[in-house]
Amino acid sequence: VLKNLPTRWDIKWEEELIKTWEEEGLFTTKISGNRPIFVIDTPPPYLSSNRPHIGQTASYAHFDMIARFLRMRGVDVIFPFYLDRNGLPIEVQVEKKYNIVAHEVPRDKFLKMCKEELDSYEKEFVQSLRRWGLSFDYWPDGTDSEEYRQMTQKTFIDLWHRGFIYEAERPTPWCPRCKTALAEPEMEYKEEETYLNYIVFKVKETGEDIIIATTRPELLPATVAVIFHPDDERYKKLNGLHAVVPPEGQVVPILPHRAANPKYGTGLVMISTFGDTRDLMIVNELKLPVRIIIDEGGRIKTGRYTGLNVREARERIIADLKKDGLLIKQERLVHNVPVCWRCKTPIEIIVTRELFVKQVELKEKLIELAAKMDFKPPEYRQMLIDWIKSLELDWPVSRRRYYATEIPLWWCVKRDGSKMPIVPKGGRYYRPWIDQPPEEVKNACVDGEIQGDARVFDTWFDSSISWMYASGFTKRFNVFDKVYPHSIMRPQGYDIIRTWLYYSLLRAYLLHGDIPFKYVRINGMGLDERGEAMHKSKGNVIDLLAPVEKYGADAVRFWAAAAGRLGSDYRYNENVIKEGKEFVTKLWNISRFVLSFEEPAAKPLLTAVDRAILAKLYHTASRVIKAYEDFDVYEPIHLLYEFIWHDFADHYIELVKSRAYNRDGVFSKEEQNAAVWTLYTVWKYSFKLIAPIMPFVTDKVWRYAYGRSIHNESLEDPSEDWRGDYELFNLVKKINSAIWRYKNRKGISLAAPLDVVLYVPETAMPAAMDLKHTHKVRDVRQGKGVEQIDEEGLVSIS
């Protein structure tokens, strides 16, 4: 082998290459100043374990493939990787690990515990992703860094002073376990088996009994109205009357409202403050009084059931109703219960003072802006629009937790108990719960006591400006003004469209009056082999390194691309990884063959067969590049696998081996050079095309051949000289396959001579010499022979 290429590919070279890439600065962001810049707004993953699972890692591999492609296209790519270290995930994890409750531990001690837990995971987390060959620029300053938090606070200060953020006391979804407010997207729904309880109310004016069905009898003391559908003839007579609510006997109005479903229960519905967002809407619409009976810890705080938690109160009230003969019947049913997205505790709606970002009044403008973003695939735009349309409440962004960005807010408490909020100007990172107030805050509080706000931001308030951070907004290479918003791409899963994507859009509009980024690339969820989501509780999480150690990173990346259709879920499939390993071997062996020849210095006169494979390459490459430009890696790997293995290796290489070696001197020197030149041309260009997906084997070979990295090469558009008709090549493939099948049927070795004359169509005659010497037949002629050997009637022999 002229270029000293070893006989076999060795997986151990992958880790050596990672070190080489790091030493050569492949992972470091470089801004040249004279090349286009493109930003990948990499999703900062929650750091809740020392490794991501393989499904999550596959999506990051997709982003890496896009970054590598763009670099080879002459683009300065900002592809950062940092961790989302804020918020409930790490707090809940620390609480569980040490069997503590955050609110019962000194704040500074709890923050230190959270940081130490995060630090213990981060190094291995990053290194495990790097083992897949991910070429991100690792930024150790995650969302909990002073740098990031100062940026978050700066945007809050801007929005506060411009009137887009306000504080108000209002009903808010609340997690009793986490003791914090939640936004709409932070609520999940889980199926729960319960009872529909049929309970007797009395009509105050007539004394008659009416029956109301509810799954939440614990909210009877919080009931403020009873409604029925305006068209329900059974209850029209009750309009304007009042109901006496058991067990505490409060009197509430009976009113018509279209929210009542005549087919559910008895058709009469109790409205409580608050059972769900429907109750909240109706209470606001009808201006009903508010009776809050559940406190921040999820316990009853008024009446005879004071001190009981929600479940205990439900059981006690049911028992009391039964004793009083007011529970008519119970029907078992399964319904969806809103729960906290992190700890899965059922959510209550209570009245608290929170900070809100305006969003409901902006819905029409946000829908208009959603149309400006380029979605890949486009159907996911509608999911975003549908979510915007569904919004009914402004976004509560304050949280009563610890490990998150502090709200830069102080209160001037007057002697009469009134409180005035003071928000300083930006410029540094503020921690009002422990820091002394800045001078401007002191100067603004006359005749009052200054108190620092102890609350923190919803973690989405931080994450929703990741596109600013990724653009170097706080870095030395701040290119925000050059790239915003036209040269930023957000890659993310469809599962966080209503959170990360939506909040990013809202924040961009409020801060800049525009979209946050031009491109939105949506990927599906990584599933196990049975098509189920991977969860520790299910025991089906697949370690991201196990298949890498067994088959190599290129093989696993092959699966990630081959399974990763844009917008669709993708299953783990070890068989596809095995195919990837075989493909690595094929790429290696192709390279060994091509590199066994000296590369021609100049382009010779090509044969028709050579021009045909180049035309097929042109056609394939054009589709591959178009797909890459659409941030798609699924189509490129399938196209390139088919072309490299089945077109180039199986057919073209086999067809021109005799001509390239020319051991018998039957071909002219120019014909021989044409074969070798074409072998090199197709090999080099196809390797550049597949290098973003399979970076290890391609780079190793390239370094043997040329002494440099393939990832620093330029990937130009396919040469216009290659454009042409490749039907000759398709025809030759059919002829080759027909002869090989014939030899198999006859038990003849594929390398053995075949003492026949081969007859082919006239259009195949330009390949006659290559066909003759490849298949070792006596001659190749135009026409029909005695014995047809293929189903189409193209190939016959005599």
What spans do the regions from the language model cover?
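Short secondary-structure boundary/capping segments
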Residues: S59, Q93-Y98, A183-E184, H229-P230, ...
